Amino acid sequence: MDELFPLIFPAEPAQASGPYVEIIEQPKQRGMRFRYKCEGRSAGSIPGERSTDTTKTHPTIKINGYTGPGTVRISLVTKDPPHRPHPHELVGKDCRDGFYEAELCPDRCIHSFQNLGIQCVKKRDLEQAISQRIQTNNNPFQVPIEEQRGDYDLNAVRLCFQVTVRDPSGRPLRLPPVLSHPIFDNRAPNTAELKICRVNRNSGSCLGGDEIFLLCDKVQKEDIEVYFTGPGWEARGSFSQADVHRQVAIVFRTPPYADPSLQAPVRVSMQLRRPSDRELSEPMEFQYLPDTDDRHRIEEKRKRTYETFKSIMKKSPFSGPTDPRPPPRRIAVPSRSSASVPKPAPQPYPFTSSLSTINYDEFPTMVFPSGQISQASALAPAPPQVLPQAPAPAPAPAMVSALAQAPAPVPVLAPGPPQAVAPPAPKPTQAGEGTLSEALLQLQFDDEDLGALLGNSTDPAVFTDLASVDNSEFQQLLNQGIPVAPHTTEPMLMEYPEAITRLVTGAQRPPDPAPAPLGAPGLPNGLLSGDEDFSSIADMDFSALLSQISS
């Protein structure tokens, strides 16, 4: 029994009798990138495992049981045993041939190394780097040369500390080499540091199945998983390799919580985990919520307070106006007249019922020559009028002589469908008497224009005074057909040139002819003879008639 006791309860290892080396600050395993020599920049400094953004630390060793002079060599070896010399190199101050070597300070036993960087080599330079390690005797564990050939993990290295001190007799004494934790290249996804950068949501139902988008640093789609841990519970998110987008994004669904009937939110940890080396990222908080059987949040939408409902009703287009309608905006319009002077009201012009009341002394003597009057009357356009069929007086002798002197061919119109004759226009009332009179009285001429019209002639034989004009005849012309006496006939269109001719020549008006019978042929104006008969007024050629008048 006494012989088995040491086997069951082994004794504590005895402390070394001499000095030994201890690593009190390990190098940071992840987060550092190995630099190529062709990059032309410093490889950086290897940080310590407790290094932060505000407090920087570096790999540190302590020589226990010894204080005095000594040397230290730091080299790179492979991660897995046998720990062969690594083709990568250490660069920095006091570095040569791929390793670091310097004298130790005799006054202290703790030594820190701040200027150490890792420089990687290309695969094509791998054999040359291994041969250089053999030539410089950089082989801390004395691995045979035959075993140094083979594959190397270029994404992970270890630091090997070799310390040489002096024994009491002054001879050099090599202490056993010490290896650090592996240091991984942050550029390689299979060894890089795992880090969750961002998620689109950090809570979900306790039943699971919520889709989450996760952004991260480079990962390998075949060597990554989303790990959930809680008190006495762990689970993994559900996704496939196709859900890993370009090694930096993962779309997964949350696993169900251990207790699907929980009544209060539960906080758990969510991490990235690499199964190959069981490396974990920094945890991120995730919250499981109780299941309310309301996946579409209908109950939450129904929770409307009175004030909320009231505000909604105020904004509703179907609700009545709550505030009185604002008064319309008044726009200032500039007035054309002065505000101080009132605008005079329009006054009707007092027209007289007869020309006998006109003071002729107010008007200058004006008589038109016969040539200009006939030419002006021919050029003045007149609207076509429908002439009623009524007995007309015989043509004036002056007009008949004018027509005989300049005969014009009358075109014969082709027979056409008879057109309806418009009914006779109603006679104007007394109120319309002043229309033409006002137009005549308002005529204004300049001296030059009037002189050009009259031909600048003052011969009394040519011009006749207006005093010799018969007022009754002029009144009949202005009234446009209103008879002065009941026994006089209604004047027609052709009486105007006749009256003007009489004004120019000074001749008296001939007596009115006897009224023609109702069945008498010819037009009412008396221009056509008895043998010229038209079945309708539409058969008459007005253009030929006007050309005769103008000639």
From Swiss-Prot:
CDD domains associated with the record: IPT_NFkappaB, RHD-n_RelA
Motif (Nuclear localization signal): 301-304
Residues annotated with N6-acetyllysine modification: K122, K123, K218, K221, K310
SMART domains on file: IPT
Location of region: Transcriptional activation domain 3: 342-389
Modified residues (N6-methyllysine): K310
Domain RHD: residue ranges: 19-306
The UniProt record lists the keyword Phosphoprotein: yes
GO biological process: animal organ morphogenesis; antiviral innate immune response; canonical NF-kappaB signal transduction; cellular defense response; cellular response to angiotensin; cellular response to hepatocyte growth factor stimulus; cellular response to hydrogen peroxide; cellular response to interleukin-1
Subcellular location: Nucleus; Cytoplasm
GO molecular function, one term: NF-kappaB binding
Region (Disordered): 309-348, 506-530
Modified how: Ubiquitinated by RNF182, leading to its proteasomal degradation. Degradation is required for termination of NF-kappa-B response. Polyubiquitinated via 'Lys-29'-linked ubiquitin; leading to lysosomal degradation.
Annotated region (Transcriptional activation domain 2), positions in chain: 520-551
Modified residues (Phosphoserine): S276, S281, S311, S468, S529, S536
Residue positions, PTM (Microbial infection) Phosphoserine: S75
Motif (9aaTAD): 536-544
Pfam families: RHD_dimer, RHD_DNA_bind
Composition bias type Low complexity, residue spans: 519-528
Cysteine persulfide sites (modified residues): C38
Residue positions, PTM Phosphothreonine: T254, T435, T505
Disease with which this protein is associated in UniProt: A chromosomal aberration involving ZFTA is found in more than two-thirds of supratentorial ependymomas. Translocation with ZFTA produces a ZFTA-RELA fusion protein. ZFTA-RELA translocations are potent oncogenes that probably transform neural stem cells by driving an aberrant NF-kappa-B transcription program.
Role noted for this protein: NF-kappa-B is a pleiotropic transcription factor present in almost all cell types and is the endpoint of a series of signal transduction events that are initiated by a vast array of stimuli related to many biological processes such as inflammation, immunity, differentiation, cell growth, tumorigenesis and apoptosis. NF-kappa-B is a homo- or heterodimeric complex formed by the Rel-like domain-containing proteins RELA/p65, RELB, NFKB1/p105, NFKB1/p50, REL and NFKB2/p52. The heterodimeric RELA-NFKB1 complex appears to be most abundant one.
Entry comment, domain topic: The transcriptional activation domain 3/TA3 does not participate in the direct transcriptional activity of RELA but is involved in the control by RELA of the accessibility of target gene promoters. Mediates interaction with ZBTB7A.
Assembly and oligomerization: Component of the NF-kappa-B p65-p50 complex. Component of the NF-kappa-B p65-c-Rel complex. Homodimer; component of the NF-kappa-B p65-p65 complex. Component of the NF-kappa-B p65-p52 complex. May interact with ETHE1. Binds TLE5 and TLE1. Interacts with TP53BP2. Binds to and is phosphorylated by the activated form of either RPS6KA4 or RPS6KA5. Interacts with ING4 and this interaction may be indirect. Interacts with CARM1, USP48 and UNC5CL. Interacts with IRAK1BP1. Interacts with NFKBID. Interacts with NFKBIA. Interacts with GSK3B. Interacts with NFKBIB. Interacts with NFKBIE. (Microbial infection) Interacts with human respiratory syncytial virus (HRSV) protein M2-1.
Entry protein name: Transcription factor p65
